[in-house]
Amino acid sequence: MKKSTIQIGLLFTLCLVSIGCQSHSVQMTSGKKYLSGYTSHGSTDANASDLNEEVKAMASIEPSIQFPARIGLVKLFNGRITNLTVDEVEAWEESRAVMGSQFGDFIPVSPMVAEMVYTPKSTHGKSKTSPSDIFRKVRLGAARQHLDHVLIYEVFSETKTTKLASSVANWTIIGGYFVPSREIKTTGFANALLLDVRNGYPYGTASATLNAKEFSASQTYRDKSRNLADKNLVSTVIKLIPEVQKMMKKLMEESKQA
């Protein structure tokens, strides 16, 4: 009930919300079984041979997920680990309660812990952090907190502002502050990936999008645009959580059969 209240409250803070989309998938396939069908073509090309060995190395991992589990939560924004909002923490906790004690716990991975244990491979100060470096940092931070698996979710948005016919009011001092002359549209995106901390096995993915729009006067549309995008991002995460929940339930069922 509390989760529904959080979600409804967030959505109503957005003036107009349209439905986006949601999806999820799970993986529990065996690396050993996958490689049993792997045949060598006897290529004399050194580059092809190296690639074949790399493919084998990437495939040779096994699923080992068991419940209850300690599952870390990592939120990525602008390529960095960031703190969860209060609304997100409450929503994740509600999801954990719905799945019951047989699920385990969601535990946020501390950005400070991740930074403490991570050492960049490159010593160049201006080198850009690559996606592989980010995943490495996440797994190291989660390992230091003794977590079994880690759910990484990244959020970002696209925002567009359009002038309306009423923008003629911008020619007046008062009208520029009070007459709605801009339409702000924003789309929030949230993508999640569940990884095994120990071997990097990808157990599942989930995604969600959410559209929102608002009208604003010309003198205030920049602030309103930022505020709308921020609120919509949190609402997009709230919309992502049910998909993660479905993914987790499937994994709980499949882990019992493994």
List each model region and its residues:
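Hydrophobic helical h-region of N-terminal Sec-dependent signal peptides
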Residues: L10-C15
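C-terminal motif of bacterial Sec signal peptides marking the signal peptidase cleavage site
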Residues: V17-G20
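Short helix-loop boundary/capping segments
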Residues: L164-V168
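C-terminal/domain-edge helix-coil "capping" segments
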Residues: Q22, V26-I65, S157-K160, P180-A258
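N-terminal segment of the mature soluble domain
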Residues: F67-K160
